[in-house]
UniProtKB/Swiss-Prot annotation:
Cellular compartments per GO CC: host cell nucleus
Species annotation: Alcelaphine herpesvirus 1 (strain C500) (AlHV-1)
Family according to the record: Belongs to the herpesviridae major DNA-binding protein family.
Entry-linked SUPFAM superfamilies: Viral ssDNA binding protein (SSF118208)
Task of the protein: Plays several crucial roles in viral infection. Participates in the opening of the viral DNA origin to initiate replication by interacting with the origin-binding protein. May disrupt loops, hairpins and other secondary structures present on ssDNA to reduce and eliminate pausing of viral DNA polymerase at specific sites during elongation. Promotes viral DNA recombination by performing strand-transfer, characterized by the ability to transfer a DNA strand from a linear duplex to a complementary single-stranded DNA circle. Can also catalyze the renaturation of complementary single strands.
A single MF term (Gene Ontology): single-stranded DNA binding
The protein's name: Major DNA-binding protein
Gene this protein is translated from: DBP
Subcellular locations according to the entry: Host nucleus
InterPro entries: DBP_sf, Viral_ssDBP_head, Viral_ssDNA-bd
Length: 1127
């Protein structure tokens, strides 16, 4: 019983139960002096004509440090002493609605509002219409201590009550206005409650702000409507309100205004219509409940502790730091906008057509899929009864198959706020000129075309910041407008957890979820792959071999590199790696691990974090988070809809009729189908309210603008809440040749033919190039020519000052090892640092031991943003809203200015970045399958895919044939865009992980010497290492110091101290060479000692009589037996 009580308590002790009762939201009223408008505007999404915009919920900026992110919001009075509450977290934006003009626009180009309205009408979406009742008078909200013109006002609302705010159904209680401290400033806030809480509704002060409603309508609801494939966002708002307020999660809500493509309705394809409708309904029911579920607050919200501000001293420093951070985020928005398969462009449910002459059997669970295709936007749609929903966009309104500004507005959900933020990010983007567009010239365009009054947006008044100018500069990078035709991955964006497995072999030998008997102890502890990588890195660090080589440093530290040292360095690394690989394989053999089988299923794993407060503080990032979750939920819903419809055919039914019969069953089944089935992990919270009576106020008195405290009982509207934790994205590392097309197999197949340039594609080329001048100081030819000539002609140059024997030995080493590397290498990567070289050799050894020698493994590569300043000649936005008279005028004004841009790099390790909680943008395809051995359960796997589109990033363009001649070899590499939060917004939690103490490094080096060396000189080597590391500091070492360095070998401390005493008596220069020569001269020769084999003799410890004969009394029997033992 006690255990059962503890379990119940554990389940009930959760974020939901801990949430206090409170209002549905707040109006915050800040003094004008609270904000540094230039700085804070960089966090917002204000455009030039904005009536409202939003800022993230940040402690010290928009909310107080003690702000509680979850609340049991009171929304209805059941009787005189009982209130009903709904649990919800807060929407992660504060919407500014008063004195908006005091903030600066994130993008200064005019006409965004009119462009969005035009695009909204063109693509058939229902525009925002304000309610008939008037707007709330903000003068009534303003505290009496301030004037209205000196106050900034914002609304902070819970996720569940956003729709009530949008529809003007919330009441503000001015009698309960109170102050809070935000960054040492007194700020007032007024609580908001639902109108259903009050009985006398005529005298209530309703909060209706058309600018706020319009902001939510486009930024949030139209974006959700696009993901759900409906055009009527106004009806969607009503549906979401019904779902939350009246708990209609199990009811179909969209099908009454759901529309379908003309071709689907025309063909009477009710199956496709029903599956489309069910996916949208389940997506709405579950996704919205996840967004409302309680979340933990995060360190991202602590604005004034962001790491980017750590070294800032002035306001301009902070502005620069924030601009650079925005530039780092920008690469993710670029990837989304320029990808053909972006989540912005997913807009259909389609059926997969069978591939003719294909060897691969079709998977019925993947037969329906979410399809991207910008051309679908122009297609006519109908309601289920055949009545027109959208008549289609005329072809004359667009530009054939070319991307237009209207498509960009569509990606922004016709929200001028989101569009302004998009344009701000696009200003950091470097253009890529197409070979099909030779007329491109931004200088000519700004000075002669953009400044003409023909421009419909700016009339030529501000050509430098006009969106038309920005679009002209980047037009070649946008994707073509094409029809979707196949099942492709879609690109999602969000934050990951810190526990990702992106090393070469991912989750190999992690031993998680595979231990059948957790309590069984093993003779040898399990040595995981993660531990192996850590050990290898530490040993390389101890040897000074962790950084990429540069020309000024040697391999083992400072000093010049030479041929002998180069060979010795890599020989040492090879020995170290081979020893660790052998130890790892032997450990698995001892533990009876079937590693040859387990390696076939290894994957890279990326954990996508579903906490809204972990998302990057940007309205576009939050929008992408919502769309990513909603799209993945719908994708997972497709197979259950397919299976259920096949058992309950929809033929003869309209979707509305069919859903009335079956939706509740589908909703119930779906809950058990998708949680912890391969993609989504979640937790079910049993929510309770511990207080028997809670503090509240008299509702009737509040109607008369009076505050009267009372005690109430609390009743929860929903006691069970399902919350998302992670989305697991996997990448299969090893190719499985079965059931794959020949085209796919050829991309991974390792051929027996040796490449002509095997050295230039080998393991040493980066190092040979970095050290070229030091290895061959008097040679006047380049590294590239030297080694390509050697590969082709096998000729060695004559180098003055270097013997032919030394040269021959060096070239033989490089030649033989490069050939050997090519034969055994299963990772299509050229190492660029000592760590990468060592890990590549290590993983090749493991793959070889596991029998994987036929196909290349898939490798993960991170595309990492790098901020750089470039000449502003082709970045006209640096001139702001100033006018331009001519080309010469533009050039004169801009030629001496610099523009902040973002470049991309492949030089950062994905495995290292994955530990720093990065923002990630990656393509994902959700595959569905049944269990093995007759298990009929459906499972899913979110697999990493490929980006589509040539303008996404320069690093995604195919390699030339200089190094590779095998077709489709690009498929061996998969890419993610990664921007770490740690080091930007978050301070590193454990600084010692990255920067070890010097004494730790010395200790590791000494212990590795003691472990790996068994010759007579081992103690001398330890002393020499101490002298090398500590220099003259060795003169002051005590016995305790030496014992620390020796660790478990501390019993030899006195021997080391004796040798140090010898050196102290001589008083030399305390260098490694000096100590080595002194100790060597004082060491006796060991050649005279002869060893013979030792034959172990089997000796019995005792000759006990186990006959059981009693030799004493019963009580003395054991004592008597012990007396016989000779211990």
């Amino acid at each position: 019983m006690a255990l059962k009580h503890q379990l119940n308590h554990a389940v009930e002790d959760n974020l939901g139960s801990k949430a206090p009762i409170g209002p549905c939201g707040f109006i915050y009223i800040y003094p004008e002096t609270h904000f540094n408008f230039k700085e804070i505007s960089l966090l917002g999404d204000k455009y030039a004509e904005a009536g409202a915009f939003s800022l993230p919920l940040l402690h010290g900026v928009t909310v107080e440090e003690a702000f509680v992110p979850n609340v049991k919001a009171v929304y209805k009075k059941i009787d005189m002493t009982t209130v009903s509450v709904k649990l919800s977290t807060f929407y992660n934006r504060a919407i500014i609605f008063h004195n908006v003009e005091k903030f600066e626009s994130i993008f200064s180009g005019p006409g965004l509002g009119s462009l969005c309205k035009e695009a909204c009408d063109l693509f058939g979406y229902v525009p925002f219409t304000p309610l008939g009742e008037g707007s709330t008078d903000v003068s009534d909200i303003c505290p009496p201590v301030w004037q209205e013109k000196d106050a900034i006002m914002a609304v902070v609302i819970t996720e569940g009550f956003k729709e009530r705010l949008h529809l003007g159904k919330l009441i503000y209680l001015k009698s309960q206005m109170h102050s809070v401290m935000i960054n040492k400033t007194e700020v007032y806030r007024i609580p908001l409650y639902d109108e259903d809480l009050f009985t006398k509704k005529s005298s209530l002060r309703r909060l209706y702000l058309p600018a706020v409603s319009e902001y939510l309508y486009y930024t949030l609801y139209t974006s959700l409507a696009q993901s759900l494939r409906v055009h009527n966002a106004a009806s969607l708002v009503e549906a979401i309100q019904e779902q939350f307020v009246h708990d209609k999660y199990k009811m179909a809500k969209l099908v009454s205004f759901k529309e379908y493509p003309l071709a689907t309705v025309g063909a009477c394809d009710t199956t496709l219509m029903v599956i489309d409708a069910v996916a949208a309904e389940l997506g709405l029911s579950y996704s919205l409940s996840f967004f409302e579920a309680p979340q933990e607050k995060t360190k991202v919200q602590d604005y004034y502790s962001w790491d980017i501000f750590a070294s800032c001293e002035t306001d301009s420093d902070r502005l620069e730091a924030l601009s650079k951070w925005n530039a780092l985020q920008a690469i993710h928005i670029h990837a989304q906008l320029f990808s053909t398969n972006s989540i912005y462009y997913v807009n259909r449910v389609a059926r997969q057509a069978p591939i003719p002459n294909s060897k691969v059997e079709p998977n019925v669970y993947n037969s329906y899929y979410l399809q991207h295709g910008l051309a679908n936007l122009c297609e006519e749609t109908l309601f289920e009864d055949g009545s027109p929903a959208f008549t289609g966009a005329p072809a004359s309104s667009l530009d054939g198959s070319s991307f237009t500004l209207q498509h960009l507005a569509y990606a922004a959900a016709f929200s001028p706020n989101l569009l302004a933020r998009m344009c701000y990010y696009l200003q950091f983007c470097q253009h890529q000129k197409s070979t099909l567009n030779p007329a491109y010239n931004i200088t000519e365009y700004v000075g002669s075309a953009a400044n003409s009054p023909v421009c419909s947006l700016c009339s030529g008044q501000c050509p430098c910041v006009c969106i038309n100018t920005l679009f002209y500069r980047l037009k070649d990078r946008f994707p073509p407008v094409l029809q979707g035709s196949r099942r492709d991955p879609y690109v999602i964006t969000g934050i990951t957890n810190v526990f990702n497995e992106l090393d070469f072999l991912g989750n190999f030998a992690s031993f998680r979820d595979k231990d059948e008997d957790q309590n069984q102890t093993e003779e040898t502890p399990r040595y995981t792959y993660w531990q192996l990588n850590q050990t290898l890195t530490e040993k390389l660090e101890a040897a000074g071999l962790v950084d990429s080589p540069v020309a000024d440093e040697g391999a083992g530290g400072s000093g010049s590199m030479n041929l002998e040292k180069f060979v010795r360095t890599f020989s040492d690394i090879d020995s170290l790696v081979d020893a660790e690989a052998a130890k790892f394989i032997n450990t698995m053999i001892k533990n009876n691990v079937n590693f040859k089988e387990s390696i076939k299923g290894v994957s890279h794993v990326i954990q996508y974090n579903c906490n809204t407060y972990w998302q990057a503080p940007c309205s576009l990032m939050l929008n992408l988070y919502y769309r990513s979750i909603l799209t993945i939920i719908q994708d997972i819903a497709l197979p259950i809809s397919t299976v259920y419809e096949s058992e309950n055919p929809a033929q003869g039914y309209k979707p509305n009729e069919w859903l009335k019969l079956h939706y509740q069953t589908l909703w119930t089944n779906f809950k058990s189908f998708f949680i912890d089935k391969g993609v989504i992990t979640g937790t079910e919270m049993k929510v309770v309210h511990a207080e028997q009576f809670s503090d509240f106020f008299d509702v009737d008195a509040a109607t008369n603008n009076m505050y009267s405290p009372v005690k109430v009982q609390v009743r929860l509207a929903r006691a069970q809440v399902l919350a998302l934790k992670n989305i697991k994205v996997k990448n299969r590392i090893l190719f499985s040749g079965t059931s794959m097309s020949e085209h796919y197999q050829n991309a991974f197949l390792k051929t027996a033919n040796r490449r002509d340039n095997y050295i230039l594609a080998g393991p040493y080329v980066k190092f040979l190039n970095s050290f070229h001048r030091q290895l061959f100081p008097n040679l006047k030819i380049s590294c590239l020519y030297l080694w390509s000539n050697f590969c082709k002609k096998k000729q060695i140059p004559c180098v003055p000052g270097v013997s032919a024997e030394a040269l021959n030995k060096f070239f033989s080493y490089i030649n033989n090892n490069s050939k050997q590397f090519e034969e055994v290498n299963m990772l299509d990567v050229v190492p660029d640092s000592y760590v990468t070289y060592a890990k590549q050799r290590l993983n090749n050894a493991i793959l070889r031991a596991c029998g994987q020698t036929q196909f290349y493994a898939v490798t993960i590569h991170s595309i990492f943003p790098k901020v750089q300043e470039t000449c502003a000649l082709e970045y006209p936005h640096v001139l702001g809203t100033s006018s331009v008279d001519s080309v010469e005028d533009y050039v004169n004004n801009v030629q001496n200015l610099k523009a902040l841009t973002v470049n991309s790099s492949l030089r950062e390790s994905a495995a290292n970045l994955a530990r720093s909680r990065p923002i990630v943008t990656l393509p994902v395809v959700v595959n569905k399958y049944t269990g093995i051995a007759g298990n009929a359960q459906l499972f899913q796997s979110a697999n990493l895919g490929y980006f589509m589109g040539r303008g996404v990033d320069k690093n995604l363009l195919g390699d030339s044939l200089f190094v590779k001649k095998q077709q489709n070899s690009y498929m061996r590499k998969k890419y993610l865009f990664m921007t770490p939060l740690v080091g930007n917004l978050l301070k590193p939690s454990y600084t010692h992980q990255g920067t070890a103490f010097e004494i730790e490094t010395v200790k590791r080096t000494i212990q590795s010497i003691l472990e790996d060396q068994a010759d007579e000189d081992v103690l001398n080597r330890v002393v020499c290492e101490l002298v090398k590391s500590l220099g003259a500091g060795c003169a002051d070492l005590t016995l305790d110091d030496i014992q620390f360095y020796l660790g478990s070998y501390g019993m030899f401390s006195e021997n080391i101290l004796e040798k140090l005493d010898q050196l102290r008596e001589l008083v030399g220069p305390w260098t490694h060479e000096w100590a080595e020569s002194v100790l060597k001269s004082g060491t006796c020769e060991t050649d005279e000692v002869q060893f013979v084999a030792f034959e172990e003799e089997q000796v019995k410890l005792t000759s006990m009589d186990h006959s059981g004969k009693v030799v004493g009394g019963k009580k003395r029997k054991i004592a008597t037996m012990f007396d016989d033992l000779d211990l």
